[in-house]
Amino acid sequence: MAKILQTQAITADTFRTNADTRFSESAFGEQVVAQELAFVQAAPVYDLLPSNFRAYTATGGTAGAENKMFKASTGTSAGGYGAIQSFRSLNYKPGEGAIAKFTALFESNAASSWQGAGLVNLGDELSFGYNGTSFGIWYRHNGLAEVRTITVTGAAGGSENLTLTLNGTAETVPLTSGTVEHNAYEIADYINASVAGWDADQLDDTVIISASSDGAKAGTYSFSSATATGTIAQNKAGVTKTSEFVAEADWNGEAVSIDPTKGNVFKIRYQYLGFGAIYFDIEDPSTGRFKTVHTIQYANDHTIPSLGNPSMKFGIYAVNLTNTSNLIVRSGSCGLFVDGQRVSTRNPRGVVNSQSVGTSFTNILTLRNRRTYNGYINQVEIQPLLLDISSESGSKNFEIEVRSTTDTGVEQNFTNAGTNLVSDVDKSSVTVTSGRLLATAVVAPQTNTIIDLKALGI
C-alpha cells in the first residue's frame, strides 16, 4: 500500500510559527547561535583545592576539598563560616549572556544560618541555597566596598611609628627614612600583611585601601606620625548589598522535585545589559533536562541595574549567625561561561624600560592589575600580548624570565601605566626571584627576542 507523503512549503512566517520561539535571528533573518566561552572550570577530583581558588574561614569554619568535592562548613560556633571562591571571574561582555553550571548539596539546615552555591562577588550574588531552614534562591545586589586613598605628603625623617586609624581602629605602622613613595610602600605592605579587613595598593605617593567586605565603614580615619605627614580621603562609601531570598514555594517557573541534601545539578543564566532577565534552572532528575524554576523579570520594572558588577565568580559558603550546629555545603564541579567569543574592545597599550643588569635576576618591568578602579572593586582582566626584549651588550648573552606573583618580597614603586587604565607598572631595579616561572629565553648580544604572552594564557 502506497504511503502519501505530505509536504508543506517552509516560509519565514512558518518557521517563526512552528519553531522554538527562543531561537534568535540576525538583522537579516538568519538563525544566530552563541558558542560558550569558558572562564572558570574546576573539579577537585584529587581532593585538593585548585590553585586558582581561595578559601575563607572564621570561628571554627573550614573550607577545602574532600571526597572529590569542594566543601565549606561552619563548625559548631556562632559566627563560624567557611567559603570557597574562584579567583577568576567570568568576564562579562555587553550583549553576551553569562552562564554558571555547577552541582551542589546541602547536608542539613538550621535556623539563623545562610548557605549558598552559585555566582558571587563582593557586592552581588545569584545562588541556590538556604535562608535558615528554607530552601530557595539568593539574589543579593549592589553592595559596595569602602575605598579610600592615603596620600603621604611628607616623608619620615627617620625610624618612627605611624599611628594609622582605619574605621576607628588604630594601627601602628613602622616607617623609615626615605621618599614619600618609600613610605607609601611600607604602609601598603603593613596593611596587606597585618591588618584584617583591608587590602592595599601602593601607587606613587599614595596607598589605595579597600575593605574586604561590603557595607559602611564610617568610623574615624587619621594619619599621625612624628615627622611623616599624610591625608586620607574617601573614594567610595561602602554600601551593604540588598539581600532578597525567594523561597522554593514562591518560585514562578516549572516545578522540579529535588532533595537538596543530595547532589543536584544547577544552572544560572543572566542577560544583564543592566536590566535583562535572570534565569535559575535545575536538572529534572527524571529526565536529565534542565527546567527553569524561577525567573527574575527585571526589565520594565526597575531604574537601577540588576547587579553592581556582572563579572562574577563561582562560590559556595556556609554561615552560622547565632546557630551552633555544623552546616556543610559541597560542590562536585563548576563551570562559568559567556555566550560568545573573546574579542578585545580597546586599543592595546604598551610600556617600555631600559635596565642595566648583572649576574642576578633584576626587575625590568612589573605589571599589576590593581584591586580597585575609580573607587570600585576591579573585576576587569588584563591580557598580556607580547614581550619584546633586546640586548645592547656587545659580547654577553643574558637570560630573561617571565614570572607571575602577587608579592615579589622586595620594595617596588608602582606608577600609572596610563590614564584611566586598570594596570600599573613598576620599573624599579630590584632583584626578583619569587613567583611562578611562566617563560624563559636567552637573548644574544645585539639581538632581540619576542615572547608571545598571549599564547601562555596568562
Residue ranges and their predicted role:
Residues 164, 280, 391-436:
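Extended low-complexity, serine/threonine- and proline-enriched intrinsically disordered segments
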Residues 237-265:
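Short, aromatic/His-centered strand-loop micro-motif at the edge of beta-sheets
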Residues 152-156, 176-179, 358-377, 405-412:
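Surface-exposed ligand/attachment interfaces on beta-rich extracellular proteins
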Residues 261-277, 283-285:
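Localized edge beta-strand/strand-to-loop motifs within extracellular or lumenal beta-rich domains
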Residues 169-173, 238-243, 287-295, 411-412:
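Surface-exposed loop/edge segments in extracytoplasmic proteins
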Residues 2-143, 242-246, 296-380, 385-392, ...:
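Low-complexity, Ser/Thr/Pro/Gly-rich disordered linker/stalk regions
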